[in-house]
């Protein structure tokens, strides 16, 4: 019997629910966690405990949160925290001139940091999928030009880290 991936809610995936849905939920949760750490100053252990026990897979203020792949969520959040000093300059270079990362809204910083981390470290996920997923996450919070900016920044970073994927077509 195949081993099931653990999720933040520790429940097996319902029949027909795709791993991608749990990864998408993990990405959204990771961005929310990174945002909360950025603006609220919460620590990594506190964030993990809060999200794993109170948010994911539960109903909060009338919204049902999807279960998320725990290992993926933790990898993205802890990886961004660990590598932020390396990720931020990459994002700064990819941003339009005159728009330093510090000037970008905190939620978009979280989206771009998570996407940049995944592009550099999660080679198991195709670059185009990573970019598309984080544009979708950005769409959950903002509209219009800002999602285009996320797409442009992550596309540039993807081409830097995964040029071979783009040369194949």
Swiss-Prot record:
SUPFAM superfamilies with a match to the protein in the record: NusB-like
Disulfide bond residue pairs: none
Transcription found in the keyword field: yes
A Pfam short name: NusB
InterPro entries: NusB-like_sf, NusB_fam, NusB_RsmB_TIM44
GO cellular component annotations of the record: cytosol
Recorded superkingdom: Bacteria
Entry annotated with the keyword RNA-binding: yes
Keywords per UniProt: RNA-binding, Transcription, Transcription antitermination, Transcription regulation
Residue ranges of coiled coil: none
Biased composition range(s): Basic and acidic residues: 1-19
Any one GO MF annotation of this record: RNA binding
Family: Belongs to the NusB family.
NCBIfam families named among the record's database cross-references: nusB (TIGR01951)
Task performed by this protein: Involved in transcription antitermination. Required for transcription of ribosomal RNA (rRNA) genes. Binds specifically to the boxA antiterminator sequence of the ribosomal RNA (rrn) operons.
Full protein name: Transcription antitermination protein NusB
Gene giving rise to this polypeptide: nusB
């Amino acid at each position: 019997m195949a081993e099931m991936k653990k999720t933040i809610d520790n429940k097996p995936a319902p029949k027909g629910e795709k791993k991608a849905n749990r990864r998408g939920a993990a990405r959204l949760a990771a961005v929310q966690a990174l945002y909360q750490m950025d603006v609220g100053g919460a620590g990594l252990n506190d964030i993990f405990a809060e999200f794993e026990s109170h948010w994911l897979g539960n109903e909060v203020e009338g919204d049902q949160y999807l279960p998320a792949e725990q290992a993926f969520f933790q990898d993205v959040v802890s990886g961004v925290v660990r590598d932020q000093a390396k990720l931020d300059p990459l994002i700064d270079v990819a941003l339009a001139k005159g728009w330093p990362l510090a000037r970008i809204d905190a939620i978009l910083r979280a989206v771009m940091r998570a996407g940049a981390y995944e592009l550099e470290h999660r080679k198991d996920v195709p670059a185009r999928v990573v970019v598309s997923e984080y544009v979708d996450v950005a769409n959950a919070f903002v509209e219009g030009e800002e999602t285009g900016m996320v797409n442009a920044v992550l596309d540039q970073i993807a081409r830097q880290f995964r040029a071979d994927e783009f040369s194949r077509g």
